[in-house]
Structures are given as C-alpha cells and as structure tokens.
Curated annotation (Swiss-Prot):
It is an enzyme of class 2 (transferase). One of its GO terms (molecular function) is magnesium ion binding. Its cofactor is Mg(2+). This is 3-methyl-2-oxobutanoate hydroxymethyltransferase. Its EC number is 2.1.2.11. It holds the Pfam family Pantoate_transf. The active site is at E195. Belongs to the PanB family. It comes from Chlorobium luteolum (strain DSM 273 / BCRC 81028 / 2530) (Pelodictyon luteolum).
Amino acid sequence: MNKNSQQKAAHVTTRRLYDMKQNGEKISVLTAYDYTMARILDRAGIDVILVGDSASNVFSGHNTTLPITVDELIYHAKGVVRGVQAETSRAMVVVDMPFMSYQLSPEDALRNAGKIMKEHECDAVKMEGGRTIADTVRRITDAGIPVMGHLGLMPQSIYKYGSYKVRAEDPAEAEELLEDAVTLERSGAFAVVLEKIPAGLAAEISRLLSIPTIGIGAGAECDGQVLVVNDILGLNREFHPRFVRQYADLNTVIEQAVRQYVEDVRSGGFPSVDESY
C-alpha cells in the first residue's frame, strides 16, 4: 500500500461540485477505463473520473460509441472504482449510460441505472439528451441516483447528425440547447456536459445554471473541463482535434520501450543475471 492510499481524502460529491461552481473553482474531469489509470488519475488530484462510452472507441476500436453495452461499461467501471479506492478515494466516478440503455422508457432507464450503481458503487450516471429525457432524468434522480446531463454534440446520435461538427451555431438550435440545459437542471441533473458548442453559448448557459457545466470543446467559461485521457497522453497519433491539448507523447514512448524490449530479448540481453532467480 502506498503513502497516498493511507491518507484518504474527502470524496468529491455532487454537493462538492456545486460548491466549487459557487466558489469559482474549476472542475477537472478525465475519462478512465481501467484500474491502473484510475489510480494514477486519483493520485494526481482529478476531481471526477468519467467511465465513458468512449471506451467503445479508444479501448475496443469501434468507430462510434454505439456498440458498447451496459455490462461492458460495468466491467470497466469496476476496475476504475477499485483503482480510486486503492489511492486517495477522492475522485468521483461517473459512468456513461450507453446507447439504448435509457431511451426506451424511464422504467427501463431506472433499471439499467440501478444495475450500474449497484454492481460497482460508482457515484453517478451520465445521459445524453435534453427535454426528450427530462422524465427519465427525473425518474432516476427521484430514486436517489445522481444524473449528469450531456448536450451539444451527442456522440450516441452521430447517425442522426451525420458528422461531428460543432453544434448550436444556428440561433434557433442555440435557443433549443439553452432550453434543454434549463430543463435538465429542473429535472434534477447535478451537472451537464457541453460538447462542441460555441464558447459564447457555453458561457451563457454556465451563467444561467446553478449546476456546474463541464465543457469539451466549449470554451474556457464552463465550470469545468473534460477530455479523454488517451488524447491528453498522446496515445492515438491519428487523432488531434482542435479542442484537445496533448500533454505527453506516450505513443512514441511506449513504442520505443517495446522496440527496446524486443531488441533485448532477441539479442539475449534480457533477462540479465540480476533479473533471474
């Protein structure tokens, strides 16, 4: 057990996120899909870890987020929760509700949200949509399950939109999105992700809502920011969207390490006497 794991920090809750917004403290969010990465993120002080349906892309290699299932996300979430618990236990863990796990009916959504919460003790679930899911958000929150909303570009609706372009540039769509944000708050959502919308609109929504806004490609005036951890670490050399800041080039580092390992094995340089029993 490391030193950090012996010094448990105050766990981030929905109330803590609300207080951070009121105090002008920015909220940091990253995705994670496994135990090891979750330990690193929690140790580094991340506020929220999102077990995103983006695992469908970056972990499983699918072109969209649609194929991933509830059970697959639960598998990822179990490792993430254990990783956080092994370190400071500070980070909140939010799990995406995957495509078609909440669209059929509020009752079906509640059943799936309850399964996600019960099987690995995460803190909340996240759902895409505005007024169309208002009754579902209300049903789930009334059952005691915190819900994070998601507006703007909604990857689960990619075939409806036809592209990953910026959303709500049209004034009419911007007004609808603003109304969706207000509806989510009134329905009980504790926060809302704003993805790929104009920075000015995101700033307006952030001022209007009392709950935190978490931006991804939505400007600096959101109450927090979320990115995919693989992107900030430079693990995907083909993916460089404008809204991502790359903090490392681990793709190159890992490739070089593997090449050196292969060379050492082939040359007989590994293992050495010191690495043998």
